[in-house]
Amino acid sequence: SGCAVNVGRGGYQAAYSVEEQIFETREQLRRLFHFTSGRGKNVIFTQNITMSLNILLKGILKPGDHVLVTSMEHNAVMRPLVQLQRQGVTFDRIPCDHEGNLILSEADALVKPNTRLLVCLHASNVCGTRMPLDALGEICQRHQLYFVVDSAQTAGIVPINMDKMHIDALAFT
């Protein structure tokens, strides 16, 4: 009808209808990515992945926290981390070899007592290599770290099982 709907605030039928559609979309996404530990309310929509990652990083990290990233990270992760560095957040890069494959054996040694989270892309937008999410998720579980994954290149194409991979937050478009 061309009329704007104010979801979550309007008390009219069109607002309720759109709210139901949004909730069902959240549930479908939750099922697609095997996020069974939560409900659709744990699925949020933002303008894009960069905004999602900024909200996550700036919302979770505090001065004194340490973060692990891969040496392949996109600027959507690195720019907010560099900003947070000025506020006392530190980070280390898990190295990759010359083909872009993560050198997983070095990850455990980079974990510090103040390491709070590991954030990584699922697949490189430059060379296409995929990060071993299962193994990284195990490291996060072992060290009780948040695990944040940027799946810009893979969401909906490569299967992602958030529960099995121990992923706490998945950013995608």
Would you name each region that the model predicts?
Residues 1-173:
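Pyridoxal 5′-phosphate
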